[in-house]
């Protein structure tokens, strides 16, 4: 049995459905969703990620606007740029490519994006909706991608023991909220957690999101584990690897996502799904 999860294939299914939906929306409204991407500076990894997002968007009929700004821009000036996008009715969704330069107040910037256009789900209002169990607003795309993969391979999540290794606002925290809603028993671990391998090796599902290359070896899992590797670590210049020691772990668990080709494509698919959702929400608001 092939136990390596093909995230690219799953993402392509989502993108194919979105392409059809966008064409229907275009026929109905005579307009298309448009995604604005704010890129500050010239971080090589960020440039690659942005290119992937733009390429996938264009492939399914989403227009894009790339706003490329200098590394030296001040927080207040960046907020002014974001406000321009907030007020532009042609823009359905806005993302600010992270990380931002250290001189910029990231929290202020993420809070400046209009919640209705915050397709990354990072605005405090959208975060509050998610953690309050309110079905409104936007949910971070990586967390949505992880949940979709898990549900594809584990149809009944109720009562499952899940260990999330990593407590970021992008993955760990939002994913914990989604899994609690599915009635999982969720444990969040992090760099200060003790006896980590002892805790994670008892879990049905382990999500690795610590950002430390091949940190998690076979002792962290059991033969029935579903392993979701969210880590994206660049080594030796261009090679990308995950947080899990993939080569030595893959034969010792039930299912595992590779890096690359696992959660990355799913994240982009759900980013574009959120863009379409924002477009539909704005259009229905205008029509009513």
Swiss-Prot record:
Native source organism of the sequence: Rickettsia canadensis (strain McKiel)
* Cysteines engaged in disulfide bonds, as pairs: none
Name used for this protein in its record: Bifunctional protein FolD
Q: Which gene encodes it?
A: folD
Q: What does this protein do?
A: Catalyzes the oxidation of 5,10-methylenetetrahydrofolate to 5,10-methenyltetrahydrofolate and then the hydrolysis of 5,10-methenyltetrahydrofolate to 10-formyltetrahydrofolate.
Known pathway? One-carbon metabolism; tetrahydrofolate interconversion
According to its UniProt record, the EC number is 1.5.1.5, 3.5.4.9
Catalytic activity annotation: (6R)-5,10-methylene-5,6,7,8-tetrahydrofolate + NADP(+) = (6R)-5,10-methenyltetrahydrofolate + NADPH; (6R)-5,10-methenyltetrahydrofolate + H2O = (6R)-10-formyltetrahydrofolate + H(+)
Q: Which UniProt keywords apply?
A: Amino-acid biosynthesis, Histidine biosynthesis, Hydrolase, Methionine biosynthesis, Multifunctional enzyme, NADP, One-carbon metabolism, Oxidoreductase, Purine biosynthesis
UniProt record, GO biological process: L-histidine biosynthetic process; methionine biosynthetic process; purine nucleotide biosynthetic process; tetrahydrofolate interconversion
InterPro entries, alphabetized = Aminoacid_DH-like_N_sf, NAD(P)-bd_dom_sf, THF_DH/CycHdrlase, THF_DH/CycHdrlase_cat_dom, THF_DH/CycHdrlase_CS, THF_DH/CycHdrlase_NAD-bd_dom
Q: Name one GO cellular component term.
A: cytosol
**Subunit (UniProt):** Homodimer.
> Any idea which positions bind NADP(+)?
166-168, 191, 232
Which family is this sequence assigned to? Belongs to the tetrahydrofolate dehydrogenase/cyclohydrolase family.
Q: Which PANTHER family match?
A: C-1-TETRAHYDROFOLATE SYNTHASE, CYTOPLASMIC, C-1-TETRAHYDROFOLATE SYNTHASE, CYTOPLASMIC-RELATED
Recorded GO terms, molecular function? methenyltetrahydrofolate cyclohydrolase activity; methylenetetrahydrofolate dehydrogenase (NADP+) activity
């Amino acid at each position: 049995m092939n136990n390596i999860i093909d995230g690219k294939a799953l993402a392509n299914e989502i993108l194919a459905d979105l392409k059809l939906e966008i064409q229907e929306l275009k026929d109905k409204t005579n307009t298309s969703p448009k995604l604005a991407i704010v890129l500050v500076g010239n971080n090589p990894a960020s440039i690659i990620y942005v290119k992937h997002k733009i390429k996938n968007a264009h492939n399914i009929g989403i227009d894009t606007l790339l706003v490329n700004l200098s590394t030296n821009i001040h927080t207040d000036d960046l907020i002014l740029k974001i406000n321009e996008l907030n007020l532009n009715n042609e823009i359905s969704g806005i993302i600010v490519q992270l990380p931002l330069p250290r001189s910029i107040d990231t929290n202020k910037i993420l809070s400046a994006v209009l919640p209705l256009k915050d397709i990354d789900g990072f605005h405090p209002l959208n975060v509050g909706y998610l953690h309050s169990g309110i079905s409104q607003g936007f949910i971070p795309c990586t967390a949505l991608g992880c949940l979709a993969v898990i549900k594809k391979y584990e149809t009944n999540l109720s009562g499952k023991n899940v260990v999330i290794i990593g407590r970021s606002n992008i993955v760990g925290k939002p994913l914990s909220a989604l899994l609690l809603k599915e009635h999982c028993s969720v444990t969040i671990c992090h760099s200060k957690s003790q006896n980590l391998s002892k805790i994670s090796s008892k879990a049905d599902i382990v999500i690795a999101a610590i950002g430390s290359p091949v940190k998690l070896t076979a002792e962290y899992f059991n033969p029935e584990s579903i392993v979701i590797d969210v880590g994206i670590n660049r080594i030796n210049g261009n090679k990308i690897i995950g947080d899990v020691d993939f080569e030595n772990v893959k034969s010792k668990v039930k299912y595992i996502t590779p890096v690359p080709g696992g959660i990355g494509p799913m994240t982009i698919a759900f980013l574009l799904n959120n863009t379409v959702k924002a477009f539909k929400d704005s259009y229905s608001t205008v029509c009513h």
